[in-house]
Regions:
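Short runs within selected transmembrane alpha-helices of multi-pass transporters and secretion channels
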Residues: 45-48, 121-141, 147-159, 172-192
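Hydrophobic/aromatic end-of-helix segments at the C-terminal termini of transmembrane alpha-helices
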Residues: 5-17, 51, 98-102
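Acidic, glycine-rich loop-and-beta core segments that form the ion-binding/anion-interacting portion
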Residues: 1-3, 13, 18-19, 23-30
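Membrane-helix interface/capping residues of multi-pass secondary transporters
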Residues: 24-27, 145, 170-173
Length: 208
């Protein structure tokens, strides 16, 4: 279900991009921006996978052991969120510094100029993506797949609405990803902080 929602989002984005102009410049600029963005996204995805592995590992450890149990899982999860944010900041700075490398991605001057601002917008979003992907990795570790899919469907709905309002330029489409990812982050943090297995109230109840 989560994959279906993601595919709907990508289809909506590509539809907005392809109908933007008849020359194909916008589509080419979006493709170049996405390629540069995905170079950093690989590292963030790796951290998400790590979160999905470490959390069940800690939860399945002995509650009485020094390294196991819910409280240790909470520490690991919080640490991963911090690392996700810091990694996102680093990757965002790195992507911003890669602007002079645009000619290596496309020789067309018009595409290079149109891709500059989307690349910078993507760089600004990297810290947000670091948090989002770690949160979703944590939810996968808790096997909260239905909630993850539900949050993704809601976020996709917001994204489609944002595209109708601001999706008439390449920069506008990339700004719409803020709406998409902030919604995903809301559902991820809600699960982590308020109503998931590692929520603060849950840990307080266990410690009493």
């Amino acid at each position: 279900l989560r994959s279906i929602a993601q595919n709907i989002t990508f289809i909506a984005v590509m539809r907005a991009i392809l109908t933007m102009d008849a020359t194909g410049t916008a589509a080419a600029a979006h493709t170049v921006s996405a390629q540069m963005f995905q170079l950093g996204l690989i590292a963030v995805l790796a951290l998400s996978t790590l979160a999905s592995i470490l959390i069940p590992q800690r939860l399945n450890s002995s509650m009485s052991g020094p390294d196991g149990g819910v409280f240790e899982a909470k520490k690991v999860a919080d640490r991963l969120l911090v690392w996700g944010f810091l990694l996102g900041c680093f990757l965002g700075c790195l992507q911003s510094c890669m602007l002079p490398l645009l000619p290596f991605f496309t020789p067309l001057q018009g595409v290079q100029e149109m891709a500059r601002l989307p690349v910078l917008i993507g760089a600004v979003q990297m810290p947000l993506n670091g948090l989002v992907f770690v949160c979703e990795g944590l939810m996968q570790g808790h096997q909260a797949f239905l909630r993850l899919a539900g949050g993704m469907f809601v976020s996709t709905t917001f994204m489609i609405g944002a595209l109708k309002l601001w999706g008439n330029t390449v920069e506008g489409v990339w700004c719409c990803f803020f709406v998409f990812n902030i919604s995903r982050l809301f559902f991820g943090l809600k699960h982590h902080l308020f109503d998931g297995p590692l929520a603060i109230k849950t840990l307080r109840a266990m410690s009493q």
